[in-house]
Amino acid sequence: MDQGPINRPHFFFTTAPMPCPYLEGHLERKMVTDLTGPEAERLHESLSRAGFRRSHTIAYAPVCPGCTACVPVRIRARAFVKNKSFRRIVRANAGVTAEYVPARATVEQFHLFSQYQQARHGESDMALMGFFDYRSMVEDSPISTSIAEFREAGGELVAACLIDHLSDGLSAVYSFFNTTLPQSRGLGTWMILWMVDETVRRDLDHVYLGYWIAESSKMAYKERFQPLEVFGRRGWIAFDERGRPG
């Protein structure tokens, strides 16, 4: 993929303060920009490497006053080695098959998405999403995006992940799974492990996981996937070096 310079001026905006969905009592603000036009793919590549994330047709990054809790993280896929716990999860899902499908919303996906939201995020706005909202989340992408569907041997859809394709790896946009299955299946963890393996199969380097938040149980789990890199003033550095002055 051509990684040349962006050829036209690009405008960034900040959102109004809103209650933070991860840290109680905090307010969040985001810097956002539209991913439109012929340079959308190239702009998304550059911004992803600068810690931005994509939602629909915008790229965003947190710029919350007085707070730096959201830390962009990515897994070094080639150096990743599954520990005992991860290997157990892989064995528990040995019968699950994965298939890339185009980023097109289906009723089957939406039913699974809704069940997941009600079980895990029942108080959030996402739990109120209808099919057309879900379709917008999946299909409104100006870049190379697909869905990985994961099915049991009998064909039942048990998990799915919306994935952006980058020249250096894969970016997990949003994943969901059947929460009624035994917790020992660890389907959320298993999807990340699958993405690591898929990244290596594609001869790429990184799995972008979005933001790690140490104080949030919903986001702190990402530190389990070592070796991990974090993005900050010094660019991408090893997770273990994040507290060192640079």
Curated annotation (Swiss-Prot):
The keyword Secreted does not apply. The keyword Cytoplasm applies. It comes from the Bacteria. InterPro entries: Acyl_CoA_acyltransferase (IPR016181), Asp_Glu_LeuTrfase (IPR017138), N-end_Aminoacyl_Trfase (IPR030700), N-end_Aminoacyl_Trfase_C (IPR007472), N-end_Aminoacyl_Trfase_N (IPR007471). Its EC number is 2.3.2.29. One of its GO terms (cellular component) is cytoplasm. It is an enzyme of class 2 (transferase). GO terms for molecular function: arginyl-tRNA--protein transferase activity; leucyl-tRNA--protein transferase activity. Pfam families: ATE_C (PF04377), ATE_N (PF04376). SUPFAM superfamilies: Acyl-CoA N-acyltransferases (Nat). Keywords: Acyltransferase, Cytoplasm, Transferase. NCBIfam families: PRK01305.1-4 (NF002343). Functions in the N-end rule pathway of protein degradation where it conjugates Leu from its aminoacyl-tRNA to the N-termini of proteins containing an N-terminal aspartate or glutamate. HAMAP family: Bpt (MF_00689). This is Aspartate/glutamate leucyltransferase. It comes from Rhodospirillum rubrum (strain ATCC 11170 / ATH 1.1.1 / DSM 467 / LMG 4362 / NCIMB 8255 / S1).
